[in-house]
Design a protein with these regions (language model features):
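A residue-level detector for the "anchor" residue at the start of short, highly conserved motifs
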Residues: 5-12, 21-240
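Disordered, charged N-terminal biogenesis/targeting segments of membrane/secreted proteins
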Residues: 1-2
Length: 240
């Protein structure tokens, strides 16, 4: 019982933090400002053993790895694999900010309203709108994710972290940006991405390249991308 109360308290705390993010969003969105402040001011930590999904008006504990899918109207469908049940919810207020927190030992994936799919690794969280704006597709990431971005020439997709931004039109890539790690990395599977560091220096990657990012320092090298994305398929690669 005490464990249940602790988890629920965590959900409430995270919901309050998200409310502050949403308040900032609604106040500044029309001014064209970025979402960096939302990520920097987000101090919620990931703990417990359940995936937590936070919307504008509720926090839900998902007991198993979850797969979410948003349609173009902002409605979401949640698939809890082990229970094989579906929970549907319709958003009455559009452009809500949602947050998913994935603890150690769990994973989740989301299909956004534009068709982009994101796989979220353990110990990670993502803040995102239920519907992307016509000319703006942005999400905030802490931890490790793999994205398969739906191509839209008129609307780049931007992934923001604490130390760098990634701008793409349509591609597949992996981002590893845990808060406790000294360095972060981006691995490009196919397509093209542009990484911008805190000091505004830019690095453009080609397929099968990785960029290590430590502060404002970057280093690009060629890699076997399968070693960096196998986690999303629950695979562990062993070398002889």
């Amino acid at each position: 019982h005490r464990r249940h109360i602790y988890r629920w308290s965590l959900s409430i705390a995270a919901a309050i933090a998200l409310a502050l993010v949403m308040n900032w969003w609604s106040t500044n969105a029309d001014e064209g400002t970025e979402l960096d402040i939302a990520l920097l001011n987000d101090t919620t930590s990931i703990c417990g053993d359940e995936v937590i999904l936070i919307t504008d008006n509720q926090a839900m504990n998902l007991k198993n790895d979850a797969s979410l899918k948003y349609d173009t109207l902002g409605s979401s469908n949640i698939q809890q694999y082990a229970l094989n049940t579906k929970i549907s919810q319709a958003s009455s207020v559009k452009n809500e900010m949602h947050q998913i927190m994935v603890p150690n030992g769990k994973r989740a994936d989301i299909t956004f309203s534009d068709g982009t799919r994101i796989y979220i690794n353990s110990g990670s969280k993502v803040i995102y709108p239920d519907i992307f704006e016509e000319r703006k597709r942005e999400i905030l990431v802490e931890g490790e994710v793999y994205l398969d971005v739906a191509k839209r020439k008129d609307c780049p997709f931007v992934v923001k972290t604490r130390e760098f931004d990634i701008r793409v039109l349509g591609t597949s890539f992996n981002v590893c940006a845990y808060r406790e790690d000294e360095a972060a990395s981006v691995v490009l599977v196919h397509g093209s991405v542009e990484v911008t560091t805190e000091n505004k220096s830019k690095v453009r990657l080609a397929p099968n390249q990785l960029v290590d990012i430590k502060g404002n320092k970057t280093q690009v090298r060629k890699v076997d991308v399968s070693e960096y994305i196998s986690w999303k398929d629950n695979l562990l690669l062993l070398h002889q």
